[in-house]
Amino acid sequence: MRFGCFKLVFLLGFWLYAGLSYSSDKGYAVAGSFKSLTNAQSMALSIDSWLKSSGIPGQVEIEESAGKTTIWNRVLIIPGDGVSARSVISLLKQGGYAGAWFLPSSRVEPKQRLPVRPSFVQQKTEATDGLSSADLISQATDPEQTVEQVSTLFDMPVALGQGTKTLIDQQDGIPRHQIAVRNFLESEVKIKVDGKVDEDIWQRIEPHDNMLVAVPGTGAPAEYKSEYRLIATEKGLYVGAIMYQPPETLVRRMAGRDQSIDVDNFGITLDVSGEGLVGYWFMVNLGDSMMDGKVLPERNYKMDWDGPWLGKSFVRPDGWSGEMFLPWSMMNVPSAKGARNIGFAASRQVSHSAERYQWPGYSYSSARFVTALNQMKVEGVEPKQQVSVIPFASVTSDQALEDDDMKAGADVLWKPSPKIQVSATVNPDFGAVEVDDVILNLTAMETYFPEKRLFFLEGSEVFDVLPRSNMSYIMKTLTNDDWSRRSRRVYSRDFMPSPISLINTRRIGGTASQVALDEGVSPFRGQRDVPTDLYGAAKLTGQVGDVRYGVLSAFEDDVEWIGQIEDGSKVDVVGPGRDFATARVIYESIGENRKSLGYLGTLVQGPIYDAEVHSLDAHFVDAEGRLTVDAQFIYGGREREEGYGALIDMTYAKSATLSHVVEIDYMDEDIDFNDLGFLARNNYARLRYVMSFNKLDMGPSLSNYRSTLIAEQQYNLDDGLVTDSGLYWRSSIFLPRRQTLRMGVGYMPERFEDIDSRGNGSYQVDDRIWADLVLATDSGKVASYSIGMGVLQEHLDDWTVNAKAGVTYRPVDWMSVDFDLDYRQRNGWLVYQAGRNFGAYSGSEWQPKLDINWYISAAHQIKLSFQWLGVKANEEGFYSVSQSGGVLVAADRTLDNHDFTVSRLTTQLRYRWEIAPLTDLFIVYNRGNQLPTQFESSFDDLLTDSFSDPVIDSFIAKLRYRFGN
């Protein structure tokens, strides 16, 4: 009844307005103009349906309109008797067609009228399934349309090729849509996830294909047709995709879980909140390898989350296909009444053309992604209680320590509702089934290593305060990379800042930091790097209304080291472990602008001291996602040593090709949150500016030029000295034959070094130069290569030269070999000795790295990894920081021989059987070493000795099995 009254009032208002307007100039209403006839027909059909349902008399026509260089397909509404074109335009604008405009009848010449209803003949290269960026631009370039009449479509149902869609809005000329997903009972579906998409129920589902080229970000229609189908049940979402493509162009390769390689794949990103809070992304490679992770607004990707889902691929005569089953229970689905909106993006990697398709087809430089996803309207999806128990058992045989160990424990997860999720681990075994990279770091700055343990990764996004707590975000910001897999992926990490975060869970169960040693006792070689066992850990996360929260606690077992006394005898070193706790709460207001306020606190209790840190954070994103502001204010530290800190980040994305970032840091001399967080240094104030620019078309043979210009200045707060300053330019460009050239140049003005002396004064460093160049070849070939060179001016003005080369060899789908070799010839290399002293060295550094992967099947992998770092350095000068400070002066040597060597080895042979999601069997052999200085040894001797007398020599067998819904 209410709907009928509303419609009557609407029609009465329309006729009143029409009668008053009929005396206006006669003419036509134009809804839009398109290069593509199919898109014009789609709009015409939707408008015709709207006119009829609204009772408005009129006829929809499509006519050709010739511009200077282009033929446009113009959508006209010819008003019926007693109705003016201007009244129709007004109602069109109220209905969402804000770009409708008036065309006087005197300006309409006889032109060819075209059919409104499409013939539905679709070519794979035609833009039949969405408004491409070119079509949207065409609405602004109709020869008779003014700038004020430019608009896109809003909230009107449009049948764009296959699958009914509603156009919501656009970003940078790229549209996003809403679709309706059909819901079935799980018992009705009966889909076997085998990648074939051949069950009868799939044929009852409308396919969607609205793919545009997102990498490189041309926004052009996809060359090859894709058909995506979605089915929702009370248990999860089924995704079926058919990728049409000539069979001879398919690239099928196997890879490990979450390993990003150049291969054909398809994927989907889901924001189950529908509010742009966090996205879950899933990909299946042709070859059945799987990748998943989370993405925080806007493109803060994290690959360190693994969910229990299914995915398979299948080769067809006309291309390939794939299927996924994504359980709702593994995602934090909020409560909602009735139908819910879920954000989504579909994607497809076409390896042979080095393109990534996506719907919506935003480039990787767009201002918004997570907050501007497509929307799917889904009925019957309710949060499900999730219970899972993952018991595990492990056996370790340590040959180096002559010790055997057996361990059993369990991970437990219980999620009764979206408001709360409880997870716990009892007697966990974080055995070394993953290895860190071998790094040479002889400075006073700590090296950051990412978390790899599943328990600490699950649900960790609530504890992320600033985007730059994530290393992948830092890399993307400073390189402007779009993660193209066109060429072998090699990057320079020189002058990349470390993350800053109050929570670095690698501290939990990591190397012990509060061990009291008796006089005359020191840790035996390698003991300081031994991880600490945990009694257990627990985590509580959830959401209540607009408030998200998280609590984490963990308890270490006693520390057990092997020590040695002055005569070389070994003794046991035992001490209590540490306890850790964190608390996080954040309130989010999601409207036209997005605003949030949060609190994060951490506590570490140890046998020697306690450390407590508190912080407040605030965040703002404007309606278009172009302006983003993040701020965090910090107070705390160790007992009686509390300090203050602040971080402010501002990003302004002017367009898809140009953006600006400003970062402000302030950390006073007392702030220190490294007992649980990560901060490379304190006592500084820094300003960093980053301008990112990209240009797709650079000429007949060059494309996708991407660059950043970085300027930064840092001051020591105690003395007001400039302790870091630099101007850096980084860029990459696509060359012919799928090659990529990456370049970097930096100029570092005169500054003072105040950290490396470990509190013994500052010394002046003259201005310096850095340059790096890397060429990478086609990653789609059986063998792809990279070669590079670089130079760096050292603190004493001498030069270090770097040369590197690498190869990836894939002779068959199920095997890959990666080998990289890095060589540095150092001159004038300043290395800290003790007290106020430094040595200047010349020397050589070799760093080979080898990875061999053999995939017996997608579920069975054998991997051999080898990393070694060898250094031979000869002292050629001895210096000391002057007592008055500010300069290095020549000093007397404190030893007869200050030469040194470094030999660090990590080797692992690992078998993994992925029995089911989160159910694995690992059999691992680890061998590693860190040799003391051997003055007379050659590089061959250093490598041989690292193998022959290891400090790590262990076999590990570990089985975990997941039980749950």
List each model region and its residues.
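Exposed, low-structure sequence patches enriched in small/polar residues
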Residues: D533, A631-N965
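Pro/Ala/Gly-rich low-complexity, hydrophilic intrinsically disordered segments
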Residues: G99-G173
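Outer-membrane beta-barrel transmembrane domain signature of Gram-negative proteins
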Residues: G361-K384, D557-E624, Q739-L792, D798-N802, ...
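Structural preference for beta-rich elements and adjacent junctions enriched in aromatics
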Residues: D142-I586, D949
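Extracytoplasmic
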Residues: S24-D25, S36-Q122, G130
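Short loop/turn motifs that connect adjacent beta-strands in outer-membrane beta-barrel proteins
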Residues: M331-R340, E379-Q386, K415, K419, ...
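Bacterial N-terminal signal peptides that target proteins for export
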Residues: M1-F10
